Amino acid sequence: MSKSTIDLKQLSIQSSFPNSQKRYVTGSRSDIRVPFREISQHPTVTDSGEAENEPILVYDSSGPYTDESYEVNIEKGLPAIRKSWILERGDCEKYEGRDVRPEDNGFTKDDDPRAAREVFPRTSSHKPLRAKKGANVTQMHYAKKGIVTPEMEFVAIRENVSPEFVRDELARGRAILPSNINHPESEPMIIGRNFHVKINANIGNSAVSSSIAEEVEKMTWATRWGADTIMDLSTGKNIHTTREWIIRNSPVPVGTVPIYQALEKVNGVAEDLTWEVYRDTLIEQAEQGVDYFTIHAGVLLRYIPLTAKRVTGIVSRGGSIMAQWCLYHHKENFLYTHFEEICEIMKTYDIAFSLGDGLRPGSIADANDEAQFAELETLGELTKIAWEHDVQVMVEGPGHVPMHQIKENMDKQLDICQEAPFYTLGPLTTDIAPGYDHITSAIGAAMIGWYGTAMLCYVTPKEHLGLPNKDDVREGVITYKIAAHAADLAKGHPGAQKRDDALSKARFEFRWRDQFNLSLDPERAMEFHDETLPAEGAKTAHFCSMCGPKFCSMRISQDIRTYAKEQGLDTEEAIEKGLEEKADEFKQAGGNLYR
């Protein structure tokens, strides 16, 4: 067994958060077990004794990796929690599937010395699933027929809404539930503007960096910190093998950009791409269990000249690949001309479209231009076609957009794409901060999330500079969890403020450990506190190093409340009386300003 296989066995799978426990809420059947993270709190200490603080239940996308009772074995993969739900519907079948070929991993022969040896250990009897002839297995199809699936009930419990509300949003196309029937390990989640704003984390190897072990660990790391979906954007060798390990161990939906792998199969020469190579790649990834595909079918031949005067041209990798193909052959984009056939594949496995914005602006100078909005019109057209097949759709958006132009993007998308979920990369609100683009983009992400975007694609500090490592992934996920939560608060999402209120109360009561534990990144919060006040006693002190004991505003506020209670006054009366006492004290001292 190779060294890299040993590395895979020894991956650093993360434990649970401090003072937290995994809790499961059971649905109408015993196999619907919806995970949450329960954060325990310490009691409030008062003069009259202790008052209990209720634990806070929060949304949890980390899968069983943070369940201390679960024994991790990534060579086995996660439990197939949806398998029985899928099979009992009776509308799918097992079949032989396609054989894995050397070109699937970017090689010309099986014995290439660069080929990964750690093929995921599937049993010899494993066969992929597909819809039976004439059947449609999409969650949208079931929703339109009035069927509430176990997946829909699972999501309803997660979101604290009714199953019927979930079904209705899916039927209308205002939400998607990405759930390939060949990814039964995934815990159902929903993407739509009437639900929690979700975030996606991009991972994937490249031709110059990263390994399978690192990408699997990055996936578990990203979901630990709160990624709701993962996109595997691998562009180097061993793409198929890397993706298999990720999907089998991913508790969240996995998306891809199939054109990247198709390009590898033709040795990186865009003009050599064909519909046949691309179609084969779609089926390959569908059989593995990819839940949504980014497909750049809106990059039409007539739109390409509209980018000629841009500052940054076409910045989407997929968009530039298709533009090059169109110009070389002077033909229409084959993803557009074969879109109906793609829909047939999507509904055979229940894969959602993520209609790619191949002409998104790559600089604020290019924001909201003719090319961007021309493509959006085509994406609206394609959305309607997909819905005719009952295929789930979300639409991708920019990009680089200054703050005053963000709302126009959201309004146009809702109108043109008939309220299909919007999935945006940021947008970045300024171009002057390489190394800090997780911040420049989070500003735009919070705004567009408030206006109605359903999912935000994270940006890490390495954006435009290099491939993110584990620390960058953590930074990007946390930054985008902040943006998504801020949007939930602004939209008035039920229950969104409960965690904020609990943390604020803990802060006012100087329950330092509860402050840390209720935060999005408990480790970082405690680390910063302990840089200046590391002693254990500082965890109960009524001040921090920012103001010190004499100038802590919250301690002073508490003193005012204590004074009011002792004097039998309310807080405003206590302040007034205190001011009067100080005035009398000033007069009795002679009324001199300086003494």
From Swiss-Prot:
Residues reported to bind Zn(2+): 400, 464
Pathway(s) the chain acts in: Cofactor biosynthesis; thiamine diphosphate biosynthesis
Binding sites annotated in the UniProt record for [4Fe-4S] cluster: 544, 547, 552
Required cofactor(s): [4Fe-4S] cluster
Comment on bound cofactor: Binds 1 [4Fe-4S] cluster per subunit. The cluster is coordinated with 3 cysteines and an exchangeable S-adenosyl-L-methionine.
Disordered: region residues: 97-134
Statement: the UniProt record of this protein carries the keyword Isomerase: no
GO CC, alphabetical: cytosol
EC numbers: 4.1.99.17
Amino acid composition bias (Basic residues), ranges on this chain: 124-133
Basic and acidic residues: bias regions: 97-120
GO molecular function, one term: carbon-carbon lyase activity
InterPro entries in the record: ThiC (IPR037509), ThiC-associated_dom (IPR025747), ThiC/Bza_core_dom (IPR038521), ThiC/BzaA/B (IPR002817)
Pfam families xrefs: ThiC-associated (PF13667), ThiC_Rad_SAM (PF01964)
One GO BP: thiamine diphosphate biosynthetic process
Top-level taxon: Bacteria
Binding-site residues for substrate, renumbered to this chain: 202, 231, 260, 296, 316-318, 357-360, 396, 423
Catalytic activity: 5-amino-1-(5-phospho-beta-D-ribosyl)imidazole + S-adenosyl-L-methionine = 4-amino-2-methyl-5-(phosphooxymethyl)pyrimidine + CO + 5'-deoxyadenosine + formate + L-methionine + 3 H(+)
Family designation: Belongs to the ThiC family.
Role description: Catalyzes the synthesis of the hydroxymethylpyrimidine phosphate (HMP-P) moiety of thiamine from aminoimidazole ribotide (AIR) in a radical S-adenosyl-L-methionine (SAM)-dependent reaction.
HAMAP family (UniProt xref): ThiC
Annotated protein name in UniProt: Phosphomethylpyrimidine synthase
Source organism: Halalkalibacterium halodurans (strain ATCC BAA-125 / DSM 18197 / FERM 7344 / JCM 9153 / C-125)
Organism placement in taxonomy: Bacteria, Bacillati, Bacillota, Bacilli, Bacillales
